[in-house]
Amino acid sequence: HHETTWLMLNQVLKHVKPGMSVLDLGAGSGILSITANKLGAEKVDAVEFDSDCESNFNENLQLNHIEKNIHYYNDDVLTWEDFNYNIILANINCNIIEELIPKFKGTKANVILSGLLKTDYKTIEQICIKQNFQVKEKMIKGEWICIVL
């Protein structure tokens, strides 16, 4: 797996508890959504813009014998407006994350972000500070970082 997937999976394992609700922005093949479901998340909403990912996502649900509690939305993450979840995941590129952070204002969720290079950190940190978010955790693997707000 890519380093960012590894970083995100570690945070999913650490933060997702039974009964929680999870939003997976940029869900791709569904690995993070599926893991959250397996950990007992009651509701997982997976949002992915790339329509080519949907069949792969659904195939992975079948392979993992998942029939409920995950909903797939072929949608642009930047138009998503509901952030009322326990956990928000976004393993997506830096430019999208820069636009997403202000949208998270007011959420009580743990927000877990990756797809960020170490060189992106200062920029992302400044955006977080401007939006009154505190970086609670920062993990590094190779050239990549994952942060928890």
Predicted regions and their residues:
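S-adenosylmethionine
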Residues: 10, 49-148
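Conserved SAM/SAH cofactor-binding pocket of Class I
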Residues: 2-77
